[in-house]
Amino acid sequence: MKRRDFVTLLAAAGVGSPLLIPSSCLGNEEKAAASERVTVGAIGVGGRGNQVFRSFLACPNAQVVAVADCYKSRRERSANTCGGKAFFDFQEILADPSIDAVTVCTPDHWHVPIALYAARAKKSCYVEKPLGLTLEQVQTCEKVFAENKVHFQYGTQQRSMANCQIGCELVRSGKIGKVKEIVVLSPNGGTGGDPTPCPIPEDLGEDGYERWLGPAPKVPYCADRCRPSGTYWIYDQSIGYLGGWGAHPLDIMVWACDADLSGLVTVEGTGKIGGPLYNTVYDWDMNIMLGDVKVKFAAANRDSTKFIGEDGAWVEVYRTGLRTSSPDLAADQDRAYSHVVATNRHAQDLIDAVRFNRTPVSNLKDAVRSDTISHLSDIAVRTKSKVVWDPVKRELVDPTPEQIALVSRPMRDPWTL
């Protein structure tokens, strides 16, 4: 094997030793006294929401006391699991002053609106990725959380994985020199979908579907709209995997370096827009400049972020591992990080943030940075134009009317930001 082709496995990166899982992660640790617990309400407990719900159940200093979901079976199942209350209306959870934090694991178009209601109700939040439906939502989220002084944790669990931590530490510590190029790959989005109207299932009901749509346009129910993966690929409700999965490798990019803050950001490229129902961008291939750093952001069959230094050394971080251009780069790297703040228990990190008043590792500032790149990419594809962003003023530079039109979207009454 050639040295330059060497694949640094986790063992060579210092993470090959057995992983010791705390008993609390398995639900075996004795719960803390009630006075020391952070009370949690779970908003959205289907699919991914159920996974997140269970991760907070496993935290010894947390107590999940209420759940809300539009689907009757989901909220009743989860309420039975945690021994808490089941609500149709998430606002009943937010109105309870005894609840400290909430998880927001709804369809994408509800992420920021519910998070804003929660912040104004003085609840800290776990918010599933992607962040916002528009640039306006993203910026409003940061402003409202700062005003209300509550904690925000993003659903970028890769920050809790040792391989990702080590890779970002290597880049931050200068092991590959000055970063000159970054390659960001994300799984592709979907297309197709059947928009044919059909009866609303009894488990959801007319009121449930109306609440499920919320601020999104009023449209007839169809099964492909509400199925777990389908909702990610409908533009009324999402920007697709540009944000929905792109959030993960883009988050690694901003965690490892600050190129997106170093100068003007320019985004241009190509992509396809599907249909008849799934009409978000797929097959994208974006060319991005972050100051003087070149970034390729493209759809692929994997999740990966590769950092290339000025002398050719590189580090590639992906969900299940870490590669480097040379085994020497990572051979002596231990977990005593000096350039990244890390945790190995994602849900517990939010609980500790609330208990000890500290910022979660997966924080809102970085969520805004990565989500902004996703939105700039979406705007560039949809307008077939180069988009320029000023990261200091946090606004588009000399935007066209078509670009301006995509910065925000109307919300259906009575929902607002």
Short names for language-model regions:
Residues G44, K175-G193, G208-C222, V265-G274, ...:
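NAD(P)-dependent dehydrogenases' Rossmann-like dinucleotide-binding region
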Residues K143-K149, I166-K180, I200-L204:
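Basic phosphate/pyrophosphate-binding loop/patch that engages nucleotide-derived ligands
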Residues P107, V112-S160, G174, K384:
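Beta-strand-loop-alpha-helix segment that lines the small-molecule cofactor/substrate pocket
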